[in-house]
């Protein structure tokens, strides 16, 4: 009788350790996923900043603005250059 109780308690202790380790691994995986999402979002923002400036975006020369936009000389923002071609 004592050996059955001992084996049952040992089994429960082992199960608790395995579940705890699994929960820790799950938390670490969740942290990695969230970190990857934040890094991807940061990279996307940086990529947008490296690209051209959109309409009414700040600029210092025409090359800063997107296609069909030019840098307004007085206000230093991108405005339409009057073209329609693709």
Curated annotation (Swiss-Prot):
Chief localization: secreted
Propeptide: 22-50
Pfam families: Toxin_12
Keyword Secreted in annotation: yes
Compartments reported by the entry: Secreted
Summary of the tissues where the protein is detected: Expressed by the venom gland.
Domain of life: Eukaryota
Residues spanning the signal sequence: 1-21
Keyword annotations of the record: Disulfide bond, Ion channel impairing toxin, Knottin, Secreted, Signal, Toxin
Intrachain S-S bonds: 52-66, 59-71, 65-78
GO molecular function: ion channel inhibitor activity; toxin activity
One GO term describing the cellular component: extracellular region
Coiled-coil residue windows: none
Tagged with keyword Protein biosynthesis: no
Alphabetized SUPFAM superfamilies for the sequence: omega toxin-like
Recorded domain comment: The presence of a 'disulfide through disulfide knot' structurally defines this protein as a knottin.
UniProt family annotation: Belongs to the neurotoxin 10 (Hwtx-1) family. 17 (Hntx-9) subfamily.
Chain's role: Ion channel inhibitor.
Protein name according to UniProt: Omega-theraphotoxin-Hhn1a 2
């Amino acid at each position: 009788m004592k050996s059955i109780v001992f084996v049952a308690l040992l089994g429960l202790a082992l199960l608790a350790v395995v579940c705890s380790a699994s929960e820790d691994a799950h938390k670490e995986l969740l942290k990695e996923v969230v970190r990857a999402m934040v890094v991807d979002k940061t990279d996307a923002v940086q990529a947008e900043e490296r690209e051209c400036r959109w309409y009414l975006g700040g600029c210092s020369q025409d090359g800063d603005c997107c296609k069909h936009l030019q840098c307004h000389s007085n206000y230093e923002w991108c405005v339409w250059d009057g073209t329609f071609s693709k």
